[in-house]
Amino acid sequence: MPKKNDKTAGGKRDQLIDTALRLFARHGYRATGIDTILAEAGVAKMTLYHHFKSKDELIVAALRRRDADWRAWFMGRVAKRAATPRERLFAVFDVLEEWFRNQDYHGCSFGQAASEFRDPKHAVHKMASEHKQQMLGYFRELAAAAGAKDPELLAKQMDLLVEGAIIHMEVFREPEVARIADDAAQKLVDEALS
């Protein structure tokens, strides 16, 4: 699981975001009340509303932090594991398995947010969608760099494998599902690059 970005350390705002992220991951967004966040963070309600107009605004800020930290961690790990663009397509699944095996794994914050805030116009849903679009764009970049005939198609296929592995992990708690997704990706990548 990615570590908190050093640039965000300190301050009551960051303390609220850090606490909220931890509680949302464990209990969900709607089930986690403001009073619980305040008690865990050791922060007064006035301080919360000084930094955030609403719980939804806190959720969006927490997801923005999670997005930046997660993508930096994930993409950095992929880059370290693979030397070539083609190898990076498969390193995605190595890093996915690494994440699944982490003791702090609590599933996808963004999938959970989208499922709890179903209205696509809601700020929380939009933030979740933005993250998913960023990841799809990353897969598109990897596919194009590897020489895929149709980078958009390969990116969507990779995304489906990743998202499917995440859901499988959520339900069955089998980290090795990342290896199965990797096997499927091998076939798709071979076809896309031929």
Can you annotate each of these PLM segments?
Residues 1-11, 193-194:
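N-terminal intrinsically disordered/low-complexity leader segments
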Residues 2, 15, 19-57, 61:
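Helix-turn-helix
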Residues 4, 124-130, 144-193:
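Hydrophobic/aromatic-rich alpha-helical bundle segments in the mid-to-C-terminal region
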Residues 17, 90, 133-136, 140, ...:
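An amphipathic alpha-helix signature
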Residues 61, 75-102, 145, 151, ...:
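Hydrophobic alpha-helical connector segments
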Residues 64-70:
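Short, basic, alpha-helical segments at the C-terminal edge of helix-turn-helix-like DNA-binding modules
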Residues 73-76, 123-134, 138-141:
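Short, solvent-exposed amphipathic helices
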Residues 87-88, 102-123:
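Amphipathic alpha-helical segments used for helix-helix packing
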